[in-house]
Curated annotation (Swiss-Prot):
Species of the source: Alteromonas mediterranea (strain DSM 17117 / CIP 110805 / LMG 28347 / Deep ecotype)
Annotated protein name in UniProt: Tryptophan 2,3-dioxygenase
Entry annotated with the keyword S-adenosyl-L-methionine: no
Subunit structure: Homotetramer.
Positions that bind substrate: F40, I41, I42, V43, H44, R111, T311
One term of GO molecular function: metal ion binding
Family: Belongs to the tryptophan 2,3-dioxygenase family.
Length: 362
């Protein structure tokens, strides 16, 4: 690194004149200055700064996966950057508590001056969602079209262009799909797994059927739920059935990618799987933190507005609550716990399989 040729002054370097002069209160324009509007603006500006940093990290991760091979050193850097995103998300979630120091009455003192501006017009947040993998076809109905109609032509074009680029979800799916399905002449992991899973599910069925703690109605419901679980297990070994369930929205990962991710989680203690497991865990936590952010945001809006519509014309709390439930990205990684078996039920990996996996995971 070269030394600075010219002296660098703190305020100039951070362009504080621009940043600290960017709080233009709408309420003051109408001679009705609201003290709390300053807090409202600063909190949202800080969110946008953090979104910019998250996108900086996320785009670097996407660039890494958008190549033919990802080496261990690169994967280490990817995991580090994803973990940084998680820490930023936690900070953003905590920041909601600062907004909650404003009372509903204080918010109403300037709210009407903001129409039709709305948080769902945050282009950086939408870029973040799309880049992670929440593209239009996976959104709730309001977001699929109505949202885009409320943007400027420039912002709409930017997001529509991003929709056509590979997301991190798609790239990770492709990376996971490169792993072999662990079937050789002397070792068939998935046959071991299927036999162990069948035995486990039979035991579960027997436990429910013979339980003295459950009523007949409860038993019927438990067995119905168990049958749904069995259907999902069966789909692991039947790609046609898997694609049918995938078309119904029960899975989003491709068949090969899901099997690879499941294998990595089953053998997460193996040194060769350490980084892939950390990657899957980090993506799971990013989705979790995003869900927490949406939920806390929805609760804050309900606290401030009740059932009023939002400034952008959405249904306010109802809209935000629905996005919390529906706009999940890496849900397959959460649901994978359904398919995990006890270590005692799994075979040891032959050395030949370890070597083969080492080649495909790079």
């Amino acid at each position: 690194m070269k030394k600075n040729i010219e002296p660098c002054y703190y305020g100039d370097y951070l362009q504080l004149d621009k940043i600290l002069g960017a709080q233009d209160l709408q309420s003051e324009k109408y001679g009705d200055g609201a003290h709390e509007e300053m807090l409202f603006i600063i909190v949202h500006q800080v969110y946008e700064l953090w979104f910019k940093q998250v996108l900086h990290e996320l785009n670097a991760v996407i660039d890494t996966f958008n190549q033919e091979a990802v080496k261990d050193q690169q994967l280490t850097q990817v995991v580090h950057r994803l973990q940084r995103i998680i820490q930023i998300q936690k900070l953003m979630n905590d920041q909601i508590a600062i907004m909650e120091t404003m009372t509903p009455q204080q918010f109403l003192s300037f709210r009407d001056y903001l129409v039709p501006a709305s948080g769902f017009q945050s282009i950086q947040f939408k870029r973040l969602e799309i880049s992670l993998g929440l593209k239009r076809e996976f959104r709730i109905d309001f977001d699929k079209q109505s949202f885009y109609n409320r943007l400027t032509d420039k912002d709409r074009a930017l997001l529509e262009n991003l929709e056509n680029k590979p997301s991190l979800f798609e790239l990770v799916d492709k990376w996971l799909s490169r792993m072999p399905l662990l079937k050789t002449e002397d070792f068939d992991f998935w046959q071991y797994y299927k036999d162990a899973a069948d035995e486990m599910l039979k035991d579960d069925h027997h436990t429910v059927s013979t339980s003295d703690m459950l009523s007949d109605t409860e038993k019927r419901q438990e067995i119905k739920d168990l049958q749904a679980t069995m259907e999902n297990f069966d789909a692991l070994f039947n790609e046609t059935q898997f694609e049918k369930l995938r078309g119904e929205g029960k899975f989003r990962l491709s068949h090969n990618a899901l099997l690879s991710a499941l294998f990595i989680k089953q053998y997460s203690e193996e040194p060769i799987f350490n980084l892939p497991f950390q990657l899957i865990t980090a993506l799971t936590e990013i989705d979790e933190q995003l869900t927490i952010w949406r939920y806390r945001h929805a609760m804050m809006v309900q606290r401030m507005l009740g059932t009023k519509i939002g400034t952008g014309g959405s249904s306010g709390h109802h809209y935000l609550k629905k996005t919390t439930e529906s706009n999940r990205i890496y849900l397959d990684f959460f649901n994978m716990a359904t398919f995990l078996l006890p270590k005692s039920a799994l075979p040891d990996l032959p050395e030949s399989v370890r070597r083969r996996l080492g080649f495909y995971l790079q």
